[in-house]
Amino acid sequence: MADTLRRLVNSSPYSVLQDKLDAWYKDYHVYSCDQNLNRCCELVELTSKIQGQLFTILNLTAQEGGHYSGVDTLKSRLLPWLGSCFTIAASAVSSDTSLSLIQESVEKDRKIRELSSVHESNLQKIEDQLCSTRIELDSVKRELVDTHIELDSTKNKSATTLLATEDEILHLKSELRVAQDQLDLYKRKLDVLDDYERQVRILRDEVSFLNAEKTVLQDRLARSRSPSPLLRRSRSVSPVRGESPTRAQLTSSSRHARLVSRFSDLYATERLESQSLLLKYIDDLETVQRILFIAAVESFQAAKLAYRQFKSRVRKTLSSTHIGPESLEDAVVDYIVRNLDLYDVQTSINDVINAMNVNPRISFPPEVDFVLISSFIREACRIAFAMQTLDPPLDLAFSSDGELYSDVKYRRSFDSEFTAPLVAFHVWPALLEGDTVILKGEAVTRRGALWKSRSRSSSPVRSRSGSPSRTFMASHSRSPSPGRLSSSRL
């Protein structure tokens, strides 16, 4: 009660009511009828609010006094006032009207209580629903937390699985590279094996030919030992030697197989030894491979030129003394086959080194000379010179940087781009017999090889006039011209 009374005092409603009365009184004649009625209704509403607060205080005060305290005061003061309120307009309102008003008031109170109970029940239901909703929300939050935990666990497992998969992929890639290297090695071994099988077939054919020739010669020898004079006369008219092939023709197959094998050994052994030697002075493997390839090509060119010159000198020497059933050309070739050691290989080595010194596609440190690989050049020249005595002679396939790669002529090197169509540079030339490739070469294929090969062509030409190796090579050169030989050697 004290709180309600304090609020009533603090709000000072009567002062507000007095101010509104004063304001209405001043402007009463100015306002219209509706405005004055609105002001009057406003004051009645304010008065009813104040009376409601006073009745609240009255109720609280009566409750504080107990069941019977203040009864006399209420009877003497409140009830007469209430009765006067109901009888103020007795002339206009009858007793039946007052009774109906009381009944309406009671009915309104009952409806208010019913609405209040309904409101409280609805409020209780809403609170229950709110509690259940909160419980469900808490469960959803817990499920969300569990889901987050499960998601984090799944992410960690996925990351672990991804790392393991990447490691496995890297391992498989490394195994694939190893398998590809082994495959390339096996392919090379297979090519070598094919070469060996070809050589074996050639040797078998040669053995068969020699056996047949041996049988023919034995028959002729038996006939030559016969005492019949007719046979002797026929032998003197048509000598047996005219039907016998030369030594070069008899050994052509075996020399062919041996020279092909020497060319393979030159690639597999001498080339790698020279490559290891050059890598001590040059860090670029590509430059070293270019040098050895050009050395092999220049060796064949120099050996073919030396063979033509040597053959011309032998033909000139033998032309004046040649007798016999075989042709002069066969005799010249047979002489060269029998005297391959007369080939002036040192002159060819000097020519190869001079050609390499002015080749624009390779460069070399000035403090080192190509004489380092003179043993490789010497073996290449000897093989090339001996190959010219075969029928048909063996030669190298034409090659140029930036050409279109051919599986028939070359094998790709291990560091090649296997989808590139052009040759960047050659590691080893292909060996031809006529137009047929009998030994594949090796090439490196890369994209943009044509532009790289053009850009390398502008390297400067080196001068070797002061190289000390030149005097060394010149001092060991010799001139085995067959003109200096006696007729007994021929």
UniProtKB/Swiss-Prot annotation:
Coiled coil in keyword set: yes
Biased composition (Low complexity): 224-241, 456-490
One Pfam family recorded for the sequence: MIEAP
GO cellular component: cytoplasm; intracellular membrane-bounded organelle; mitochondrial matrix; mitochondrial outer membrane; mitochondrion
GO biological process: mitochondrial protein catabolic process; mitophagy by internal vacuole formation; response to steroid hormone
Coiled coil: 112-210
Transmembrane segments: none
Keyword DNA-binding in record: no
Subcellular compartments: Cytoplasm; Mitochondrion outer membrane; Mitochondrion matrix
Region (Disordered): 224-253, 455-490
Keywords linked to the UniProt accession: Coiled coil, Cytoplasm, Lipid-binding, Membrane, Mitochondrion, Mitochondrion outer membrane
Record's function text: Key regulator of mitochondrial quality that mediates the repairing or degradation of unhealthy mitochondria in response to mitochondrial damage. Mediator of mitochondrial protein catabolic process (also named MALM) by mediating the degradation of damaged proteins inside mitochondria by promoting the accumulation in the mitochondrial matrix of hydrolases that are characteristic of the lysosomal lumen.
Name the record gives this protein: Mitochondria-eating protein
Lineage, top ranks: Eukaryota, Metazoa, Chordata, Craniata, Vertebrata
